[in-house]
Amino acid sequence: MPAKSRQNPEVREFILRNVATHPADIGSLTIQEFGLSRTSVNRYVLRLIEEGLLEAEGNTRARRYKLRNIVSVGFSIKLSFGLFEDAIWRDRILPEMKDVPQNVVDICQYGFTEMLNNAIDHSASFDCLVTYEQDYCSIKMMIADEGIGI
């Protein structure tokens, strides 16, 4: 178990909330916002990488950071009469949503079941691909079918 962090949670949160829009200059932006040294900001970034919340791409001069997926799930399902969207939600997606606030879970459930119901009832497709991705700041769900697209 890693040692207890003495890092300022406000700095960590700032980095995580802003890295998507500032992948190449998150260090400079954090220095400007908090008045920290480059070394100190680098420690924050390295800790977030070690914790699996950020990932780095490129070498030192061209290094870019991005949020790392905490969860990434994809699966295919057969669209058939009698398929219940709430069962797919309950059995396949909901178990992946650990530590997500209940109000967010409720919104995601509504969106997911409506999208899947639409694919079942209206796409005329035989199957669909479901993906669920979650990082520190966002949740992305996609249902892709090969239907008629109206």
Where are these regions (language model features)?
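Key DNA-contact positions within bacterial/archaeal DNA-binding proteins
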Residues: 39
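Conserved short strand/loop->alpha-helix "switch" segment adjacent to the catalytic nucleotide/phosphoryl-transfer site
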Residues: 28, 32-33, 92-113
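Short amphipathic alpha-helical interface segments
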Residues: 8-28, 32-33
